[in-house]
C-alpha cells in the first residue's frame, strides 16, 4: 500500500470540494484545491473531481489534480477516464498531457486481465490513448516539425499495435491537417515526405491500414483529380491488396470520378 505523507483533507473541506464538483463549479473546486496544497485527497474524491472536471472540459483542474495528486502518489486512474481526460487535454491545448496519460496507463498496468472482455477493453483504451498522443503531437508541432516526424510518431504508436486494428482517417484529423500544411508549404522535402512514404523509406510499416490512411490524407489535399490519379497510380505501383476504404470515401466526397 502506498504511504501518504501529507495529511488527509479535512471533512469540511472535502464536503465543500465535493459539492463544488458535483454542482459543476470547477473554478471553485480548483481554488479549494490550491488552498489545500498540503492536504491529500482520498481516492474516491480524487476520481470524482477528475470525472467532473473531464465531463465539464475543465482542463486546469485536470492538470492540477494530475500533477499534484495522481503523479506524486502513483494513483491508478481508470482507463476510460484517462481516455476522456486525454481528449479534453488535446482540444484544450494541454498537449504534453496525453503522452503522460499513456505512459501512466502502461506503467501501472491498468486494464490487464485474463478474461476476453478485460483484454478487449484494455486494447480499446490503449488504442485511444495512443491515438490521442499522435494527434497531440501533430497538433502541437503542426508548423514546427516535418511531416515525416509526425508520420514516424504515428508508426511508433499505432502501426505496432497487436492485432493490426483498422486505422481510419476520420480518427486522425490533426495528422490529416498536417499533410495539408505540408502540401501548402510546397517545399520539395515536404512533398517527398508525403509521397516517398509510399514504399521509399527506411521505416518498416506493419499494419495494412497505415499506408492507406496516409494515402487518404494526401488525396484529401491534392489540388484536383489529375493529381489524385497520379498519387493513386504511384501507390498501386508499390502496394497491392491494401484496404482503400478511406481513399474511396475521400474521392467520392471530393467529387472526383476516379476508379479505385
From Swiss-Prot:
- Annotated Gene Ontology cellular component terms: mitochondrial inner membrane
Query: Where does the source fall among the domains of life?
Result: Eukaryota
- Which InterPro entries does the UniProt record give? Pet122
Residue range covered by the transit peptide: 1-8
Write out the coiled-coil annotation as residue ranges.
none
Topology class, membrane: Peripheral membrane protein
- Principal place of residence: mitochondrion
Q: Per UniProt, which keywords does this protein have?
A: Activator, Membrane, Mitochondrion, Mitochondrion inner membrane, Transit peptide, Translation regulation
The subcellular localization recorded is: Mitochondrion inner membrane
Specify whether Membrane is a keyword of the entry. Answer: yes
Supply the Pfam families for this chain.
Answer: PET122
For this protein, what is any one GO molecular function term? translation initiation factor activity
Query: Among the record's GO biological process terms, what is one?
Result: positive regulation of mitochondrial translation
**Chain's role:** Required for expression of the mitochondrial gene for cytochrome c oxidase subunit 3 (COX3). PET122 seems to work by directly interacting with the small ribosomal subunit to promote translation initiation on the COX3 mRNA.
Q: What is this protein called?
A: Protein PET122, mitochondrial
Q: Which organism is it from?
A: Saccharomyces bayanus (Yeast)
> Upper taxonomic classification of the species?
Eukaryota, Fungi, Dikarya, Ascomycota, Saccharomycotina
Amino acid at each position: 500500500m502506498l504511504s501518504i505523507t501529507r495529511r488527509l483533507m479535512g471533512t469540511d473541506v472535502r464536503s465543500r470540494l465535493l459539492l463544488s464538483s458535483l454542482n459543476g463549479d470547477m473554478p471553485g473546486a480548483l481554488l479549494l484545491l490550491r488552498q489545500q496544497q498540503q492536504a491529500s485527497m482520498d481516492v474516491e474524491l480524487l476520481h470524482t473531481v477528475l470525472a467532473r472536471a473531464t465531463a465539464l472540459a475543465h482542463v486546469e483542474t485536470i492538470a492540477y489534480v494530475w500533477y499534484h495528486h495522481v503523479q506524486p502518489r502513483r494513483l491508478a486512474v481508470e482507463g476510460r477516464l484517462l481516455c476522456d481526460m486525454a481528449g479534453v487535454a488535446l482540444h484544450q491545448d494541454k498537449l504534453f498531457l496525453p503522452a503522460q496519460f499513456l505512459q501512466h496507463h502502461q506503467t501501472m498496468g491498468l486494464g490487464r486481465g485474463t478474461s476476453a472482455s478485460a483484454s478487449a477493453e484494455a486494447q480499446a483504451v490503449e488504442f485511444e490513448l495512443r491515438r490521442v498522443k499522435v494527434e497531440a503531437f501533430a497538433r502541437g508541432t503542426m508548423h514546427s516539425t516535418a511531416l515525416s516526424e509526425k508520420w514516424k510518431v504515428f508508426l511508433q504508436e499505432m502501426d505496432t499495435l497487436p492485432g493490426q486494428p483498422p486505422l481510419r482517417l476520420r480518427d486522425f484529423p490533426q495528422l490529416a491537417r498536417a499533410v495539408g500544411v505540408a502540401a501548402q508549404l510546397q517545399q520539395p522535402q515536404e512533398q517527398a515526405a508525403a509521397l516517398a512514404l509510399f514504399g521509399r523509406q527506411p521505416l518498416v510499416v506493419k499494419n495494412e491500414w497505415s499506408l492507406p490512411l496516409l494515402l487518404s490524407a494526401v488525396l484529401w489535399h491534392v489540388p484536383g483529380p489529375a493529381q489524385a490519379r497520379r498519387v493513386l497510380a504511384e501507390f498501386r505501383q508499390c502496394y497491392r491488396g491494401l484496404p482503400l476504404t478511406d481513399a474511396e470515401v475521400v474521392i467520392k466526397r471530393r467529387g472526383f470520378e476516379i476508379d479505385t
